[in-house]
Structures are given as structure tokens and as C-alpha cells.
UniProtKB/Swiss-Prot annotation:
<dbReference type="Pfam" id="PF02183">
    <property type="entry name" value="HALZ"/>
</dbReference>
<comment type="function">
    <text>Probable transcription factor.</text>
</comment>
<dbReference type="InterPro" id="IPR045224">
    <property type="entry name" value="HDZip_class_I_plant"/>
</dbReference>
<feature type="compositionally biased region" description="Polar residues">
    <location>
        <begin position="228"/>
        <end position="240"/>
    </location>
</feature>
<dbReference type="Pfam" id="PF00046">
    <property type="entry name" value="Homeodomain"/>
</dbReference>
<feature type="compositionally biased region" description="Pro residues">
    <location>
        <begin position="247"/>
        <end position="257"/>
    </location>
</feature>
<dbReference type="GO" id="GO:0043565">
    <property type="term" value="F:sequence-specific DNA binding"/>
</dbReference>
<dbReference type="InterPro" id="IPR001356">
    <property type="entry name" value="HD"/>
</dbReference>
<dbReference type="InterPro" id="IPR017970">
    <property type="entry name" value="Homeobox_CS"/>
</dbReference>
<feature type="compositionally biased region" description="Basic and acidic residues">
    <location>
        <begin position="114"/>
        <end position="128"/>
    </location>
</feature>
<feature type="compositionally biased region" description="Low complexity">
    <location>
        <begin position="56"/>
        <end position="65"/>
    </location>
</feature>
<protein>
    <recommendedName>
        <fullName>Homeobox-leucine zipper protein HOX23</fullName>
    </recommendedName>
</protein>
<keyword id="KW-0805">Transcription regulation</keyword>
<dbReference type="InterPro" id="IPR009057">
    <property type="entry name" value="Homeodomain-like_sf"/>
</dbReference>
<keyword id="KW-0539">Nucleus</keyword>
<feature type="region of interest" description="Disordered">
    <location>
        <begin position="34"/>
        <end position="128"/>
    </location>
</feature>
<feature type="region of interest" description="Leucine-zipper">
    <location>
        <begin position="159"/>
        <end position="203"/>
    </location>
</feature>
């Protein structure tokens, strides 16, 4: 140090000619001795003596180019070989019994990894029985098998998420492309509609008015037909009402030559005027049919009623009684008994 101070004190304002040659020479021996003593004596102490000050700020410091001290190298290490281990080998790490920091990791062999992969493909959930069976078959501890399955399951989930993400991304791209195509088609169709509307308005402006007029005329014709049918119905109903409102015609007057006695019973009176002896209704009925049988001849006839007018000039009471009995005979009213029994000779003898 004294020599350095003397050299610095005797230095001229300008550098001597051999200054560069002196700077390229190695450090003095006493500096190297001090560095070796510091490394060897303290045994890896972190504090080092400061390097000598640089004589010139423009020249590189030779002390910075020196190799790093050997104190940073890990003692008893494997030389950084753990960084080159694969994922499958790292899955099998974990130490046999929870070892310390300096314990070397145990790596799985290729055959063990293949066996574990086949077991994981069969089922990603590890049961205690299967865990113990795999540990015995592979010569591993159950904790190592459980840790490997846990790490493998995490990687499998990550890969599944990546696959799902890729599938969703493809679906999104396809949906966007389809949406863009639909939007372009929609705009094209809108343009065609606008063009068609403009062409129709320019070329056939009167066509729409003609169609509207024809439609209005058709509506008017339908209205007229409806009104005509309604008027016809009203006329028919008025005629029916008039016919109903008219009084019934009076009956025709009776002829003047007809007697008031026969005016009520014209048919029976004509029958009653047959002769003095009268007309027998049963005889008229028998004449129209077959000839009377012997039984009919021998059997006495039922009591007859003479409808003719008697010689004593019986009035309208006798004619009305005869008409009533004749109507009862024709209608089958045989249960009613006549008020009197007429005689066939036509003369009544009153004693």
C-alpha cells in the first residue's frame, strides 16, 4: 500500500509513456495473497475486501473479469441434474418418509410410469385398495402413488380445458362466419326489395289504382246484390202480410128455390124425398153389394129408421133426427139407441 501511495504522489500531471503497459500487468502478489486468505480462512464468508480502486475510469477493471468464487457452488449436489427430469419422473418425487432439503429425489422408472398410466386410464380416481395394490406391485410407497395420481389428474384437467377451449373457439368462429353471411344476405335482400318497389312505382303506377278500382267495384256490386235480395225478401213478406190481413170472403148465399127445412141438410133431404113409403138405407147398401144370402133373408132385419117425410107432414124435427141417426150409422155409432122405432108402412096410428 505504501508503494501505491508513493507512486500516486510521484505521478506527474500527465501520464508517463509506459502507463498503459503497467495497467495491463496482473495485480501484485500481495493482493492475490489477501484474496486467497479471505476465501480459505473464513470458509465461505459473504463479505469480501473491496477491490482496489481503478486508476482510470476509462479502462476496464481487471478484478471484474475474475471468475466467481467457489462458495456459491452447492456442496454435495448432483450438478443440476434435477432440472432435466421429465414430468413423469417429477410426479414420482416426494421422498420416501418426508425427507429433508438435502435428500435426493427418487425417480420412477419407465416401466413404473407405464403401469401407472394404464391404471389412470382405467380410472382417474384412486381408491385405497388400488393404491395399496399398485404400491406393492411397483415397489413404491402408497404416498408416492397418491401424489403421482394427483399430479396426473391435474394435468388431465388442464388438457381437457384446453380441448374444450379449442372446441368452443371453433364453434365461435363458425357462428361468426354464419352470422356475417346472414347479415350480407339480409342486406342484399333488402336492396332487392327496395329496387322492386321503386321499379313498380315508376313503371306501373296506374296498375295499383286500377286494382283498387276493380276491388271497389266488386264490393259495390256485392252490396247491390245484397240490397236487391233484401228488397225481394221484404216484398215477399209484405205480400204475405197483405194476404193475411185480407178478410176471408163471405160464404155464397143459398139458392132461392131451396126450402128452409132442407137448407141445413141438403144431402139427407134429397134422400128423404124418394117416395111416400121412404127409402130404406139397408136396402140401398144391400143392392150395391152381392145378392142376399138365405140366412140374410130369413134373419129379420134390424130396426130401420125412415128418413123420408111422413104423410102427416112431420117438420124439421123429424128430418134433423133422421139425419143424425144416418150420420151415426155411417160412423159406426151403433151403441146409441134411436128415440123411436119407425114403421115401414109410412102411416102412424095413434090410439
Amino acid at each position: 500500500m505504501a508503494s501505491n501511495g508513493a507512486a500516486a504522489g510521484a505521478m506527474a500531471p500527465f501520464f508517463p509513456p509506459n502507463f498503459l503497459l503497467q495497467m495491463q500487468q496482473p495485480l501484485p502478489l500481495h493482493h492475490q495473497h489477501l484474496q486467497d486468505h479471505a476465501h480459505g480462512g473464513h470458509g465461505g464468508h459473504h463479505l469480501l475486501p473491496p477491490p482496489p480502486p481503478s486508476l482510470s475510469p476509462f479502462l476496464p477493471d481487471l478484478a471484474m473479469d475474475a471468475p466467481p468464487p467457489p462458495m456459491y457452488e452447492a456442496s454435495g449436489g448432483d450438478g443440476g441434474g434435477g432440472g432435466a427430469a421429465s414430468e413423469d419422473e417429477e410426479d414420482g418425487c416426494g421422498g420416501g418418509g418426508g425427507g429433508g432439503g438435502g435428500e435426493k429425489k427418487r425417480r420412477l422408472s419407465v416401466e413404473q410410469v407405464r403401469t401407472l398410466e394404464r391404471s389412470f386410464e382405467s380410472g382417474n380416481k384412486l381408491e385405497p385398495e388400488r393404491k395399496a395394490q399398485l404400491a406393492r406391485a411397483l415397489g413404491l410407497q402408497p404416498r408416492q402413488v397418491a401424489i403421482w395420481f394427483q399430479n396426473r389428474r391435474a394435468r388431465w384437467k388442464t388438457k381437457q380445458l384446453e380441448k374444450d377451449f379449442d372446441a368452443l373457439r371453433r364453434q365461435l368462429d363458425a357462428a361468426r362466419a354464419e352470422n356475417d353471411a346472414l347479415l350480407s344476405l339480409n342486406s342484399k335482400l333488402h336492396a332487392e326489395i327496395v329496387a322492386l318497389k321503386g321499379g313498380a312505382a315508376a313503371a306501373g303506377g296506374g296498375g295499383s289504382s286500377c286494382r283498387q278500382e276493380a276491388a271497389s267495384e266488386l264490393i259495390n256490386l256485392n252490396v247491390k246484390e245484397t240490397e236487391a235480395s233484401c228488397s225481394n225478401r221484404s216484398e215477399n213478406s209484405s205480400e204475405i202480410n197483405l194476404d193475411i190481413s185480407r178478410p176471408a170472403p163471405p160464404p155464397p148465399p143459398p139458392p132461392a128455390n131451396e126450402s128452409p127445412v132442407n137448407r141445413g141438410i141438403p144431402f139427407y133431404a134429397s134422400i128423404g124425398r124418394g117416395g111416400a113409403g121412404g127409402v130404406d138405407i139397408d136396402q140401398l147398401l144391400l143392392r150395391g153389394g152381392h145378392s142376399p144370402s138365405p140366412a140374410a133373408v130369413t134373419t129379420p132385419p134390424p130396426p130401420k129408421m125412415e128418413l123420408g117425410i111422413t104423410g102427416n107432414g112431420g117438420g124439421a124435427d123429424a128430418a134433423a133426427a133422421g139425419a143424425g141417426s144416418f150420420g151415426g150409422l155411417l160412423c159406426g155409432a151403433v151403441d146409441e139407441q134411436p128415440p123411436f122405432w119407425p114403421w115401414a108402412d109410412g102411416h102412424h096410428h095413434f090410439h
